[in-house]
From Swiss-Prot:
Produces ATP from ADP in the presence of a proton gradient across the membrane. The gamma chain is believed to be important in regulating ATPase activity and the flow of protons through the CF(0) complex. This is ATP synthase gamma chain. Transmembrane segments: none annotated. The gene is atpG. It holds the Pfam family ATP-synt. InterPro entries: ATP_synth_F1_ATPase_gsu (IPR035968), ATP_synth_F1_gsu (IPR000131), ATP_synth_F1_gsu_CS (IPR023632). One of its GO terms (molecular function) is ATP binding. Gene3D superfamilies: 3.40.1380.10, ATP synthase, gamma subunit, helix hairpin domain. GO terms for cellular component: plasma membrane; proton-transporting ATP synthase complex. Signal peptide: none annotated. It is a peripheral membrane protein. F-type ATPases have 2 components, CF(1) - the catalytic core - and CF(0) - the membrane proton channel. CF(1) has five subunits: alpha(3), beta(3), gamma(1), delta(1), epsilon(1). CF(0) has three main subunits: a, b and c. The keyword Transport applies.
Amino acid sequence: MAGAKEIRSKIASVQNTQKITKAMEMVAASKMRKSQDRMAASRPYAETMRKVIGHLANGNLEYKHPYLEERDVKRVGYLVVSTDRGLCGGLNINLFKKLLADMKAWSDKGVQCELAMIGSKGVSFFNSVGGNVVSQVTGMGDNPSLSELIGPVKVMLQAYDEGRLDKLYIVSNKFINTMSQVPTITQLLPLPASEDDDLKRKAWDYLYEPDPKALLDTLLRRYVESQVYQGVVENLASEQAARMVAMKAATDNGGSLIKELQLVYNKARQASITQELTEIVSGAAAV
């Protein structure tokens, strides 16, 4: 019964792993709900900021801010939002594939790329495949704050202000629902004119106090910060949803594997009993 004992050991091992994946699934489900609440709370602010900035981009401003002007593109920057932990399916790798394809498209045009990383998985990936990482922040946990994101954002905005970057993008996963998270690359700077027909029909006329430059300097920076923060909280919700789904799949696969091993064990046990009976009958016949 040496084979049967080995199979029993494998079944026990899979059952223990199944308990772990089930617990991780339940933890991820709880964290996902909290992440969704944070995402829902920050969305109205981010969307309102986007609308206000969209009106500014479509309007005839007294002062043309550098963040609103298109430039000849020689260098582009990416703020890349990844996770700090794994076991979340293909969430990170799908995002990295999309980013690499976009970087290759720019590289084919002779444009250089710089990366600011948010999340340790992105740092590890681009350190291994090669990438010009100029800033990074990791270990933000499950409740990130805007102050933790200021470092990478400040580095990229300073590079844009000094003319070392001509475009700035944010790369993150957009949360659609529990089963669907979409990798997205969104242009932050220069601010793209809104494609929203409603914004084009309803032009707003602004009066600036004290002056357009001071107001736009503050407002446009706040806009970039709000979009980055929204990208981070949506990516966090996507991470927990992907982890919950991955752990559920692992738990279900564990159950299927246990059934298969149980069947193999039963066959091995049956073969052992049959062999013992054959030996007894043969011994009795010999007597």
